[in-house]
Curated annotation (Swiss-Prot):
Protein name: Protein P20A
Species name: Grapevine leafroll-associated virus 3 (isolate United States/NY1)
Range of residues in the leader sequence: 1-19
Entry superkingdom: Viruses
Key words of the record: Signal
Length: 177
């Protein structure tokens, strides 16, 4: 079985959080679980790929030259020296984010279906969150029913880590959504 790049999985997870693609979120979650399981059989390949992937993803998110320098310094200090256990911790956080986002998306769709929002007239706004302190995903469901048509929007936002962890774990989770 070929190992998918962690950077590809992170980018797909980030895009799926923006587009609310339920099926892709489930597939990414399963691919991340397979990646985590591969870390026990092929530690060297997973460690190399996770170092490169996390570094490339975070450096690509930098907005200015100075923030890029700071990010590279953090990456040099943390990512380049990380062990396989630290890599598993990063991957575990991503699995929790994917699981929380699937739960948040299902909960928001349940609210939309159960409250029969399409039959009521007027504006509506619902928000909530799913997940743990490591990976909390907030959903915002808003819209307006004008009688003939209903216009609504669903937005998923990754809140980020509230518990322990290093700086890059906080940055990685909060830069997804």
């Amino acid at each position: 079985m070929k190992l998918l790049s962690l950077r590809y999985l992170i980018l797909r997870l980030s895009k799926s959080l923006r587009t609310n693609d339920h099926l892709v979120l489930i597939l990414i979650k399963e691919a991340l679980i397979n990646y985590y399981n591969a870390s026990f059989t092929d530690e060297g390949a997973v460690l190399r790929d996770s170092r490169e992937s996390i570094e490339n993803f975070l450096v690509a998110r930098c907005g200015s030259q100075n923030s890029c320098r700071v990010m590279k310094a953090l990456i040099t200090n943390t990512v380049c020296k990380m062990s396989i256990e630290t890599a598993r911790s990063f991957i575990g956080d991503l699995i929790l984010v994917a699981d929380s986002s699937v739960s948040a998306l299902e909960e928001a769709k349940s609210i939309k279906d159960n409250f029969r929002l399409r039959k009521r007239r007027g504006k509506y706004y619902y928000s909530g969150d799913c997940g743990s302190d490591v990976a909390k995903v907030k959903y915002i469901l808003s819209g307006e029913n004008r009688g003939l048509g209903c216009v609504d929007s669903l937005k998923l936002v990754c809140v980020g880590r509230q518990g322990g962890g290093n700086v890059l774990q906080h940055l990685l989770i909060s830069s997804l959504g």
